């Protein structure tokens, strides 16, 4: 629950807004009233840690900020006092136990210990693939943390690759995918390029509200797009949902033929603006050893 607000505006309110999106991913049934009550409680909690709108968070240490357990205990105090407002978010308090003391506490209940001073950083959350609810929360936290680091950095050139980006697309919480859409627009002005990738177009386009489909918005604002082979039903879905028209030749290029997956790997349609070409990615010998042979880097023959 540390400093991840924007450098412009009010960092505390920006942080609380980010936290509310994360809490909605934990508790998708949260309504507007519950969100308002929780935001009020979060402001009180930060005040308890001597953090308010006037605080210069840049001078604080990581350990100066509250963690999940602090929020859980703070809400428990509200419960003990019999506050009527607490009864409106009692279900959320119950769910929060898993993240503060229970099953997921080792992952989320603590101060940030990530060091991204290395010029190449890889956040691996593969171990969470069978815990989709937790995976989505962690994915969003990583994205918000990286955005904070870029916005508050020195604007040196950087590149952010977001693999399996459909993970963040929750039909019940479109705000998470909207966050990615907003990040793509914002980070460009901080000299950061963003490349989202997904192998599930249906999931990627599942997050929408009354205003727009945020997965579609992410795709539409991309200056370059690369469509790799997919099932014919996914091609039809893409045409229908994105109002796209592929020629028969183009459909052939991006449709998986059963039994030929390895042969078609790396082939697809590459879009730059309104122009599109058939393209094939060819790996170098070193890349083949790393990717297909799964060799440790120390054993790679150069």
Say what each PLM segment does.
Residues 1-192, 260-263, 270-272:
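P-loop NTPase motor domains
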Residues 295-297:
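Extended active-site and interfacial segments that coordinate phosphate-rich ligands
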Residues 138-141, 242-244, 286:
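Short, solvent-exposed amphipathic alpha-helical segments in soluble enzyme
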Residues 299-302:
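Acidic, low-complexity intrinsically disordered tails
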């Amino acid at each position: 629950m540390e400093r991840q607000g924007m450098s412009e505006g009010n960092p505390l309110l920006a942080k609380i807004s980010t936290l509310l999106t994360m809490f909605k991913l934990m508790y998708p049934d949260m309504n507007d009233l519950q969100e308002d009550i929780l935001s009020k409680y979060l402001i009180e909690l930060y005040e308890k840690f001597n953090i308010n709108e006037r605080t210069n968070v840049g001078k604080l240490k990581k350990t100066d900020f509250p963690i999940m357990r602090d929020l859980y205990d703070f809400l428990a105090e509200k419960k003990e006092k019999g506050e009527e407002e607490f009864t409106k978010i009692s279900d959320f308090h119950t769910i929060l136990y898993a993240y503060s003391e229970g099953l997921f506490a080792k992952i989320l209940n603590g101060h940030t210990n990530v060091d991204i001073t290395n010029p190449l950083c890889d956040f691996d959350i593969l171990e969470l693939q069978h815990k989709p609810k937790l995976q989505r929360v962690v994915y969003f936290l990583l994205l918000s943390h990286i955005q904070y680091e870029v916005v508050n950095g020195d604007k040196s050139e950087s590149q952010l690759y977001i693999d399996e980006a459909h993970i963040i697309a929750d039909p019940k919480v479109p705000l998470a995918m909207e966050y990615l859409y907003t990040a793509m627009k914002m980070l460009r002005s901080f000299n950061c390029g963003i490349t989202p990738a997904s192998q599930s177009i249906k999931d990627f386009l599942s997050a929408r509200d009354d205003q727009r489909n945020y997965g579609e918005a992410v795709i539409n604002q991309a200056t370059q797009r690369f469509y790799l082979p997919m099932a014919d039903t996914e091609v039809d879905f893409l045409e229908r949902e994105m109002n796209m028209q592929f020629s028969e030749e183009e459909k052939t290029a991006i449709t998986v033929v059963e039994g030929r997956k390895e042969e078609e790997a790396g082939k697809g349609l590459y879009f730059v603006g309104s122009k599109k070409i058939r393209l094939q990615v060819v790996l170098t010998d070193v890349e083949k050893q790393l990717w297909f042979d799964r060799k440790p880097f120390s054993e790679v023959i150069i």
